[in-house]
Amino acid sequence: MKAGRGTLGVCLAKQSQGGDPDKLACGLKKRSQKRNPSPSVVPSWTDQPVADSHGKSRATGAAASEMKHGQSKASLLHHGGFKVLQSLKGSVGRSSAPAASLGKAVALSPAPSEEQLAGMSHGIGDALGSDWPGREPRATDNRGQYLKGESWVSGRPGHPKLREVGFLRGEPPSAGPKGLGTWSELSHRYFELGQLPYAYPYYKVLPEGELRCVSLDRFNPGLSEETVEDEKTLKFFRWSADSRGVTGSAIFQISKSLMP
């Protein structure tokens, strides 16, 4: 610069004083090439930058803004899952948390892992097992499973509905099934069924001459008949449990004498 004027201003001044326009243009081109790098080296997005009021290139500012926005999105994707899980955990931990906040946390959270699902199922099962209205807490082992032999009706001792259908509190009799898929004939009509979950709301009492049975919620009864010595009909009831605390299936055999 000379006297505060740029190269273009100097050339125009010389031309006005009678200088050769071709020589002035050639000199202007050479000076521009010395000050600026080769066009092949300069990226295309920097061609013809427009200076803003602060003297910065708008293209450079746009590139920096885009890079910052990309970093923010990457940070959100990386840490967003952890923050949402923490929010969900806090909402579940507070019994007075609004349902709306929990719904938002669930809607924003990614798909839970198998361990998280197992933990949620375990917590729900414990709550239902111990806080059921009107029941006594049942004993569990160190893994939260109900102890073998713990009666499902222990929280309802002597309930009239259980007595009416013939189910008593306690373990199955010695003549009952010993293992999964095995059975033996029961000589008496009334027997103890210790692993029956809350049958009294679904009881059904038949006439005295008929078999007494119970319709259980969440159970799929399957009935098969077999004639033995033309005197007795054996009916086998198979229940496959899908609720917590009942493992596998139990087959119980109820016998009824057809003799008068």
UniProtKB/Swiss-Prot annotation:
The gene is Fam220a. Keywords: Cytoplasm, Cytoplasmic vesicle, Nucleus. Expressed at high levels in the testis where it is detected within elongated spermatids during the late stages (steps 9-16) of haploid germ cell development and in the tubular lumen (at protein level). Its main location: nucleus. Promotes dephosphorylation of transcriptional activator STAT3 by interacting with both STAT3 and protein phosphatase PTPN2. This promotes interaction of PTPN2 with STAT3 and mediates STAT3 dephosphorylation by PTPN2, leading to negative regulation of STAT3 transcriptional activator activity. May be required for spermiogenesis or sperm function. This is Protein FAM220A. Interacts with transcriptional activator STAT3; the interaction occurs in both the nucleus and the cytoplasm, is enhanced by IL6 and promotes STAT3 dephosphorylation, leading to negative regulation of STAT3 transcriptional activator activity. Can interact with both unphosphorylated and phosphorylated STAT3 but interacts preferentially with phosphorylated STAT3 in the nucleus. Interacts with protein phosphatase PTPN2/TC45; this promotes interaction of PTPN2 with STAT3, leading to dephosphorylation of STAT3 by PTPN2. GO terms for biological process: intracellular signal transduction; negative regulation of transcription by RNA polymerase II. It comes from Mus musculus. Residues 35-47 have a biased composition (Polar residues). It is found in: Nucleus; Cytoplasm; Cytoplasmic vesicle, Secretory vesicle, Acrosome. It comes from the Eukaryota. GO terms for cellular component: acrosomal vesicle; cytoplasm; nucleus. Residues 1-75, 129-158 are annotated as: Disordered. PANTHER family: PROTEIN FAM220A (PTHR31980:SF1). GO terms for molecular function: STAT family protein binding.
